[in-house]
From Swiss-Prot:
It is found in: Secreted. Disulfide bonds join C54-C68, C55-C66, C60-C69. This is Conotoxin reg3f. The modification Cysteine amide is found at C69. One of its GO terms (cellular component) is extracellular region. It comes from Conus regius (Crown cone). The keyword Nucleus does not apply. It comes from the Eukaryota. Pfam families: Conotoxin. Residues 1-20 form the signal peptide. GO terms for molecular function: ion channel inhibitor activity; toxin activity. InterPro entries: Conotoxin (IPR004214).
C-alpha cells in the first residue's frame, strides 16, 4: 500500500512539479511611490488649497485635507 502511494506521489511530482506553482517572491512588489507618480497634481485635491475644505472640529484633527483647523 505504501509503495503504491510513493509511486503515485512520484508520478504527480513529475507531471506537476512544485516549481510550476507561483510563489510570492515571483510577484512584483507593490510600489506606492510609483502609483503616486501616475496621479498628477491637477487631479489630486490634496495639492489644491482652494479645493480643500474646512472640516468640523472632530474631523479636522484626523484629516490632512483640512486647512482651516
Amino acid at each position: 500500500m505504501m509503495s503504491k502511494l510513493g509511486v503515485l506521489l512520484t508520478i504527480c511530482l513529475l507531471l506537476f512539479p512544485l516549481s510550476a506553482l507561483p510563489l510570492d517572491g515571483d510577484q512584483p512588489a507593490d510600489q506606492p511611490a510609483e502609483r503616486m507618480q501616475d496621479i498628477s497634481p491637477e487631479q489630486n485635491p490634496l495639492f489644491h488649497p482652494d479645493k480643500r475644505g474646512c472640516c468640523p472640529f472632530p474631523a479636522c484633527t484626523t484629516h490632512i485635507i483640512c486647512r482651516c483647523c
